[in-house]
């Protein structure tokens, strides 16, 4: 998809960019694969804010996505490429030979009419899902499982991909989109190809109102708060933060401070840490 730019007819339009949605083939989602989506506004079951800067936004319906890709041996044909308001990637509606319909994350270069397959015997072709142990070294993949049968959890955002680097016993070595190199069980499934809609990261929201449509609320700087609200708060005028390093609102060091557990169980699977 290409990026569309606007002329600076107003301060909000100046610099604003949007995707042209040229790859989208329909604006009518499959009703049987929709579910209601209640707004949480960043609150947990106690009503406490656990994720800041969320709330409002346009009403959405959830699209039920097939992350497991467990429909083995039954060919499916791509019916539509659709927009999904709940993720950065586009989604593809697949009509299977037995009559079932499922949504999958749309890989780059997947077109309407193409055929896809799942299972250990599937070809190494864009959109096909198979165990990592059956995928050749050097192949780009996405929607990777961490536990067989759980469904894809890694590399699902627009424009991302991971690469199979090697095989070692029952594990496959994969370089993730973050640059981290880790071992994943060979029985875990992945989908061949890169995630589509790679232009997503180039979009400039342009104005505050558009961010509110997306459910993003304002981010207030700690230095303009009161001391009771933030470690950076207080002072007369534009005061320095008065601390050795920047802090979170809860008094923890931030901007480069490592928060990962020192003895994380998954450390043994990580060969090289991600890039900063």
From Swiss-Prot:
Signal sequence region: none
GO biological process: cytoplasmic translation
One cellular component (GO) term of this entry: large ribosomal subunit
Annotated region described as Disordered, given as residue ranges: 224-276
PANTHER family: LARGE RIBOSOMAL SUBUNIT PROTEIN UL2M (PTHR13691:SF5), RIBOSOMAL PROTEIN L2 (PTHR13691)
Biological function: One of the primary rRNA binding proteins. Required for association of the 30S and 50S subunits to form the 70S ribosome, for tRNA binding and peptide bond formation. It has been suggested to have peptidyltransferase activity; this is somewhat controversial. Makes several contacts with the 16S rRNA in the 70S ribosome.
Protein name in the entry: Large ribosomal subunit protein uL2
Source organism (scientific name): Geobacillus kaustophilus (strain HTA426)
């Amino acid at each position: 998809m290409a990026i569309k730019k606007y002329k600076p007819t107003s301060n909000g339009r100046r610099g604003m960019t949007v995707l042209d949605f040229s790859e989208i083939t329909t604006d009518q989602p499959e009703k049987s694969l929709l579910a209601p989506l209640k707004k949480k506004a960043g609150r947990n079951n106690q009503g406490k804010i656990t994720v800041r800067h969320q709330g409002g936004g346009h009403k959405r319906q959830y699209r039920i996505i097939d992350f497991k890709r467990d429909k083995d041996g039954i060919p499916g044909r791509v019916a539509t490429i659709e927009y999904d308001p709940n993720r950065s990637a586009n989604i593809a509606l697949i009509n299977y030979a037995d009559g079932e319909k499922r949504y999958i994350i749309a890989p780059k270069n997947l077109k309407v009419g193409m055929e896809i397959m799942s299972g250990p015997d599937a070809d190494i072709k864009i959109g096909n899902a198979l165990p990592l142990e059956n995928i050749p070294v050097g192949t780009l993949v996405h929607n990777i499982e961490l536990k067989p049968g759980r469904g894809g959890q890694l590399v699902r955002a627009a424009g991302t991909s991971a690469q199979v680097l090697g095989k070692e016993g029952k594990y496959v070595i994969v370089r993730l989109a973050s640059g981290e190199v880790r071992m994943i069980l060979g029985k875990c499934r992945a989908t061949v190809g890169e995630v589509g809609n790679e232009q997503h990261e180039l979009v400039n929201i342009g104005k505050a109102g558009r961010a509110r449509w997306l459910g993003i609320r304002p981010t207030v700087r700690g230095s303009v708060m009161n001391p009771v609200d933030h470690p950076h708060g207080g002072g007369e005028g534009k005061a320095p933060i008065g601390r050795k390093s920047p802090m979170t609102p809860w008094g923890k060091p931030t901007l480069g401070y490592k928060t990962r557990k020192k003895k994380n169980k998954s450390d043994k699977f990580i060969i090289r840490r991600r890039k900063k």
